[in-house]
C-alpha cells in the first residue's frame, strides 16, 4: 500500500495518469513526499509496478502518528515515515490479527517541526 499526505498527492495522481504530473501541493509535515516527481526518476515506474493500492492521510493523522511513535518507541522519525504509520493505523481493522510490516525510514525532521508537533 502506497500512502501520501492529502496535501501532496502528486505521486498517487501521477501513477493513476501513467505519467509524471506537475500538480500543486499544500504544506505538509511530510517533507520527503511533498512536491513533484523528478523527470527521469525511476520512482514512478517502481510505484506503478510494485504498489497495489494507494491511500492518503491527513496532516492531523501524520501529527498524531509522529507524536505516538516518538512516545511509544523512543525513536525520532520524520513526517514521511509517519505517513506510513498513520496509513497503517487508519487500516487497523483490516490488519487485525495479521503480521504487518511498515517501512519506516528517515529521522530528518527540523527542530521547528518537532516543536510544532510536540
Regions found by a protein language model. Name each.
Residues 1-49, 95-96, 100-118:
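Glycine-rich phosphate/pyrophosphate-binding loop at beta-loop-alpha junctions
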Residues 40-96:
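Active-site-adjacent helical/loop segments in soluble small-molecule enzymes
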Amino acid at each position: 500500500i502506497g500512502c501520501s499526505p492529502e496535501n501532496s498527492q502528486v505521486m498517487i495522481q501521477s501513477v493513476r495518469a501513467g505519467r509524471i504530473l506537475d500538480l500543486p501541493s499544500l504544506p505538509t509535515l511530510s517533507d520527503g513526499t511533498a512536491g513533484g516527481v523528478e523527470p527521469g526518476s525511476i520512482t514512478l515506474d517502481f510505484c506503478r509496478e510494485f504498489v497495489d493500492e494507494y491511500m492518503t492521510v491527513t496532516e492531523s493523522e501524520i501529527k498524531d502518528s509522529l507524536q505516538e511513535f516518538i512516545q511509544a518507541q523512543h525513536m525520532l522519525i520524520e513526517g514521511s515515515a509517519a505517513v506510513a504509520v498513520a496509513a497503517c493505523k487508519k487500516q487497523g481493522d483490516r490488519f487485525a490479527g495479521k503480521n504487518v510490516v511498515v517501512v519506516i525510514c528517515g529521522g530528518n525532521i527540523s527542530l521547528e517541526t518537532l516543536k510544532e508537533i510536540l
